[in-house]
C-alpha cells in the first residue's frame, strides 16, 4: 500500500457478502470515501472464502481519488497490496465480535502505519448495540454447507489459525 493511502478515515458501508459489495459498486453507491466492511466471512461463518475479487473494485475507487479501505473478518491473498485493509478480525462477526456491531455510516479510522482500526463514534452506544445475526445465504444450501457445519461450528478464530483440530496447548 502506497504511503499516501495508509491512513483512511471514512464512514463505514457494511455488507454481509462480497456479492453485495459488487452490486453496490455497480449501482454507483460506493463512489465516495468509504471503509467497506464485509462481515460474516470468517472460519465459523463460511470458511473464510478468498475476498481478492474486491481489490479491483476498491482499486478503481481509489484510482478515482477516493480514500477507501476494506475491513473484514475474512481473508485476502498476498496479491491484494494496493488497498489498505484490516483482515482476519477476531473474534469474528458470527461469534459476536465487534465487526457485527458496525452499521452503515459509522465513522472509522484505519491506520496501516500503527496497525489500528478505530471506531470514532460514541463508544458507549457502540458497545450497547446488539450484534447483527448471520443469516446463511439460502442459495448455498446443498453445496456442502450441511456437510461441513460441524467443522464451522468448531473452527477456532482466525487469530489462532482457524483450525477445528484441538491439540494440547491450543485455545
Task: Identify what each model region corresponds to.
Residues 1-171:
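Feature captures the catalytic cores and cofactor-binding loops of soluble hydro-lyases/lyases
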Amino acid at each position: 500500500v502506497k504511503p499516501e493511502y495508509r491512513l483512511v478515515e471514512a464512514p463505514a458501508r457494511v455488507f454481509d457478502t462480497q456479492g453485495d459489495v459488487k452490486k453496490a459498486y455497480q449501482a454507483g453507491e460506493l463512489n465516495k470515501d468509504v471503509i467497506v466492511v464485509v462481515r460474516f466471512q470468517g472460519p465459523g461463518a463460511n470458511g473464510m472464502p478468498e475476498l481478492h475479487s474486491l481489490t479491483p473494485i476498491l482499486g478503481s475507487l481509489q484510482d478515482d481519488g477516493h480514500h477507501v479501505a476494506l475491513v473484514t473478518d475474512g481473508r485476502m491473498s498476498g496479491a491484494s497490496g494496493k488497498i489498505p485493509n484490516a483482515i482476519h478480525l477476531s473474534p469474528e462477526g458470527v461469534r459476536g465480535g465487534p465487526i457485527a456491531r458496525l452499521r452503515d455510516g459509522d465513522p472509522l479510522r484505519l491506520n496501516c502505519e500503527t496497525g489500528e482500526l478505530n471506531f470514532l463514534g460514541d463508544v458507549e452506544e457502540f458497545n450497547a448495540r446488539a450484534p447483527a445475526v448471520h443469516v446463511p445465504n439460502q442459495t448455498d444450501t446443498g453445496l456442502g454447507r450441511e456437510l461441513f457445519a460441524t467443522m464451522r461450528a468448531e473452527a477456532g478464530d482466525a487469530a489462532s489459525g482457524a483450525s477445528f483440530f484441538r491439540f494440547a496447548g491450543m485455545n
